[in-house]
């Protein structure tokens, strides 16, 4: 974008602006948003000061940030994102927004140069003083001494939570001399202490818990945007007492008890344990001298104000909202007089003393004495939308007027295409920058702005893809912390006490923890399991691979099995029969498909390439991979049968559209079958829009078409005039004949009835089939289906999808009103989820009284199909502002303009339901909001409370996500394999079911499990060899280490585990050293064919297999074991060698030496 800033800074008009920009009370008028951003960016580039850009709300701040990223390095651009909503302080915070705020405050506190975008709400928000913030930014260096208690206290003050194992942002842990911290900014950090000295600092991976690189020093930023010290708590308690005493007599007697409870709950907090999320509500009472963000800026900072009058309007409504919000919480006994979240001074008072430049599109009256006024003439650019003639005449006008023409396109390929297009129009253009660019020609560069603009006085026009092709601007990637799926779904296999488990031989039990037992004078760790009645089972940790976590549908509570009964055997046999049947069915289908002859497509045509380049967004890697897999299938002679699986809004439709276009380009017809009329309409519109520039005839068959139109479409399919038909089950009627059907695309097949599914099966015959589903297919199942069903998975969301901001709140009409007003004020729409059909119309009336000007519709499952579809269609077409609905919206409907979801009684929903419902919003490039409301003061059932707790962790991270994924995976498995399988999955648990299915499929395909070259080794030694609780306190970590030891087969793996133990838990005690010795002995035994090593008191028995006996070189063995002398004796039993070792001092070392010698005495068989 250098060319643009070069052209601007050389112009006299900009130079006039530059002279007064940064002087007090300057007004700049006439600039469109993108033109304004270009000027502000150039001013910033030329100055050495901090620049503060104030907007009226966060939405505007986001838009300006996207454009500014084109000109300013992401490292120097900061945003202070505060929602335009009071309830934010009353709900679970989004870690993403919090980390952006912390990054901004830290940069300001360090006096860094930068361009800082702050919405009005952020400007007024109460904050910790800058001095306190600076005192709580820590830099740690190797070799420094720290006071550990003081350091840990400071972390708590900064908003960190102490956990036994660090797995989420904002946590820390202490194990021995190791401190782990996961800051909001940067990598997780591991600090190893030698007494009080920092011995080393390493970053580590939360997924593996292993250290990565050593670092010399690290900055630890806060985990909250408030600092809360003991002093702050003391001051807070005093202020709170006064506020309570002041409020109590002034409120209604009926709520005084509620106020007392609110006060008591806050009074309990001590600095050693408090929740920043809750205390932030009391920010007005925390600090003797609270600050705002303006106090963090340098005294010579420059301020730019975007649309002063709009800011004043927002300020007015913000004050009214804040007053009404605080009044409501006081009146309901949930708040105190004097409580507030923002500074009430006028925004002009806040920025007094700084030089302010005001930007306004129109010349306007302002209550400010202006020193300078700079007027620009700026015009919007004609919208061409691919219309060649209009484009050519407009470009010709620019050339004739000697304009500098800057064309911005988003990829290198598009630069070449654009140049070719301009060349056809005889418009001179260049793509490489020269020292100076002559006017009267176009320069085409990679870049993007939200809109184009024309500055006639400067002789400059900037044209973007939005005007050229109606493309939306791609949002720039910004340095937000990437949250990997692995981190989100850390592992639903984590075993917690009380979890249900499945033992391969004994069935479903309950996990009670790891216990160290003394058996025969030695200590060992066992997994303790509870079965039916008082039955208990202790499983040695070295047999833990027989125990899996029981994973089934969310609402499924399994029945415990009885130990020693036949019930479990019967259950397993039933499931075994079922998986064998399904495996056979899958194999038969697969063989049938392999034998079938389909149409073999050629390589992509030139039209295909052009069509794909017209897609206005970057494909995600998963989309690109799925498209390649589908094209590979189409280019084979056997018919395709592929399942494309991806979350709602992850871009499955574009993948399907490309496959459809490929089929049409080779003269084939495409049928696109969808479960509902509305989806048919939406897919039809997408196809029309995507293929408008190509000779493709697309028709729709649904209730929205007249009988005459349907008759014409049927005729067109028969004659071949229609290339693509989109439709509901109407497409399945027997009187429809295709001239040459080549591709059938089925969306959400599981939503069709049995009769329709049968008809789909007949349609599939010898035709390529692509099935789309939004329900995730679990990876384990994916693996067991390899070679039987072709699956493509899209797991990554498109780049410009913002994470949905999720709030968990008590039900309160003022919260609801605020959320509704905020969405409608940005011309958006709202889903209001109310799942009681009998009183849904009363709920609509209640909301209508709250929002008299809003158009409110109702949708529920008891309406006729026609009424429901018409209501939904009106909502999609923006005829209603709010849709009060039941869970009927859970699947399928795409309403890009609806970006707020409010769910009443969220505690009654399953997590997977909430996850899917939340996917309804945040579908466009706007931020989506989801409010999960639960009744105030309601006594929740234990399950609802657990669920609510999980929902509270349902922001970007947290276990709520894991549980939702787990339940959806099981639903996905049911959809893939048939509903009756769902029941079988629930009886034996998901993992065991997947394992049984995989074995059955492999057996039917004749693939034998590779038998281990070396048999299983049993090592039984009378030694205290285990992981003591004093060394590893966290049971999950303990189980994880035992699992790794159980799977160890090489010495490299042993070294790796030793490193991990020292890395994560510090130096290990003698019990752990012995455990590692036993694993080392086992590895030698594995490699040398030893089957048993048993401690018999005074001697140790060692048994070799017959095969190992044949392979051993006796001479080499006897020579190598001479140092053992007479303590070792050799014999033969049933053609297999046995060795006894008499125990003496250091017998464990002797045993290690002996098994190593046995391994080294093995003859290597000639395979070459």
From Swiss-Prot:
Query: Mind listing the GO molecular function terms for this protein?
Result: ATP binding; damaged DNA binding; DNA helicase activity; hydrolase activity
Record-annotated membrane-spanning stretches: none
Binding-site residues for ATP, renumbered to this chain: 646-653
PROSITE patterns given for it? HELICASE_ATP_BIND_1 (PS51192), HELICASE_CTER (PS51194)
Read off the SUPFAM superfamilies from this record: CarD-like, P-loop containing nucleoside triphosphate hydrolases, TRCF domain-like
Q: Where is this motif: DEEQ box?
A: 747-750
Supply the EC number(s): 3.6.4.-
Pfam families per the UniProt record, alphabetical: CarD_TRCF_RID, DEAD, Helicase_C, MFD_D3, TRCF, UvrB_inter
Subcellular location field: Cytoplasm
Query: In this protein, which residues make up the domain named Helicase ATP-binding?
Result: 633-794
Taking the first listed entry, what is the main subcellular location of this protein, grouped into a coarse class?
cytoplasm
Which keywords, in A-to-Z order, does the entry hold?
ATP-binding, Cytoplasm, DNA damage, DNA repair, DNA-binding, Helicase, Hydrolase, Nucleotide-binding
Q: Name one GO cellular component term.
A: cytoplasm
Q: Which InterPro entries match?
A: CarD-like/TRCF_RID, CarD-like/TRCF_RID_sf, DEAD/DEAH_box_helicase_dom, Helicase_ATP-bd, Helicase_C-like, Mfd, MFD_D3, P-loop_NTPase
| Start and end residues of each Helicase C-terminal domain | 808-969
One GO biological process term: transcription-coupled nucleotide-excision repair, DNA damage recognition
| Physiological role | Couples transcription and DNA repair by recognizing RNA polymerase (RNAP) stalled at DNA lesions. Mediates ATP-dependent release of RNAP and its truncated transcript from the DNA, and recruitment of nucleotide excision repair machinery to the damaged site.
Of which family is this protein a member?
In the N-terminal section; belongs to the UvrB family. In the C-terminal section; belongs to the helicase family. RecG subfamily.
* NCBIfam families documented for this protein: mfd
- Its protein name is Transcription-repair-coupling factor
